[in-house]
Amino acid sequence: MLKQVEIFTDGSCLGNPGPGGYGAILRYRGHEKTFSAGYTRTTNNRMELMAAIVALEALKEHCEVILSTDSQYVRQGITQWIHNWKKRGWKTADKKPVKNVDLWQRLDAALGQHQIKWEWVKGHAGHPENERCDELARAAAMNPTLEDTGYQVEV
């Protein structure tokens, strides 16, 4: 039987692009571990992706996961768009390169053999864990220490 894990995530950006951060909570049998980090120049979508990636990469064995995010970009990307992106060699329907491909590929790899149920929660609507993740992400964004080497300025 797989371990049942809950993950809650959020990303924040002070300006888009600008300093950003992510926050994540991993819960297993009432025990919680939090994750957060801040980047000097990034985007909100990249931080939303990083929150999910870091939490999933922390899992040491195959798990049954309920992952809650307030990002439709992340939820739709992983449940609907990614399959066609991969078939097209990481291109969109109009043959343009997928944005944030480095993180989408990393998220795809982090899924591993986990059974994941992706849940969308409305942001800033009083969901306790989402609010905590938002606080972690915003605090990290206000004190960025890392460089987002995968961030590319759009021209």
UniProtKB/Swiss-Prot annotation:
InterPro entries attached to this UniProt entry: RNase_H, RNaseH-like_sf, RNaseH_domain, RNaseH_sf, RNaseHI
One GO term of the biological process aspect: DNA replication, removal of RNA primer
Output the SUPFAM superfamilies linked to this UniProt entry.
Answer: Ribonuclease H-like
Say if the entry is tagged with keyword Membrane. Answer: no
Q: Where does Mg(2+) 2 bind?
A: 10, 134
Q: Which UniProt keywords apply?
A: Cytoplasm, Endonuclease, Hydrolase, Magnesium, Metal-binding, Nuclease
Required co-factor(s) are: Mg(2+)
Name the EC number(s): 3.1.26.4
Q: Which GO terms describe its cellular component?
A: cytoplasm
Which superkingdom does the taxonomy of this entry point to? Bacteria
The EC category is hydrolase
- Residues engaged in binding Mg(2+) 1: 10, 48, 70
Q: Which ranges carry the RNase H type-1 domain?
A: 1-142
| Pfam families on file | RNase_H
Q: Name one GO molecular function term.
A: magnesium ion binding
The record's cofactor note says: Binds 1 Mg(2+) ion per subunit. May bind a second metal ion at a regulatory site, or after substrate binding.
Reactions the enzyme catalyzes: Endonucleolytic cleavage to 5'-phosphomonoester
The record's subcellular locations are:
Cytoplasm
* HAMAP family linked: RNase_H (MF_00042)
Subunit field text: Monomer.
Family of the protein in this entry: Belongs to the RNase H family.
Q: What does this protein's UniProt record list under function?
A: Endonuclease that specifically degrades the RNA of RNA-DNA hybrids.
According to UniProt, the name of this protein is Ribonuclease H
Please name the source species.
Escherichia coli O127:H6 (strain E2348/69 / EPEC)
| Upper classification of the organism | Bacteria, Pseudomonadati, Pseudomonadota, Gammaproteobacteria, Enterobacterales
